[in-house]
């Protein structure tokens, strides 16, 4: 699971 990666491509997903 690489959530930090999705946050990079999808900042909105980070929230």
Curated annotation (Swiss-Prot):
GO cellular component, one term: extracellular region
Major localization listed first in the record, in broad terms: secreted
Pyrrolidone carboxylic acid modification, residue list: 1
A biological process term (GO) from this entry: neuropeptide signaling pathway
Disulfide bonds: 7-14
Protein keywords: Disulfide bond, Neuropeptide, Pyrrolidone carboxylic acid, Secreted
Keyword Chloroplast set for record: no
Superkingdom of origin organism: Eukaryota
The family this protein is said to belong to: Belongs to the allatostatin family.
Name the record gives this protein: Allatostatin-C1
Organism: Delia radicum
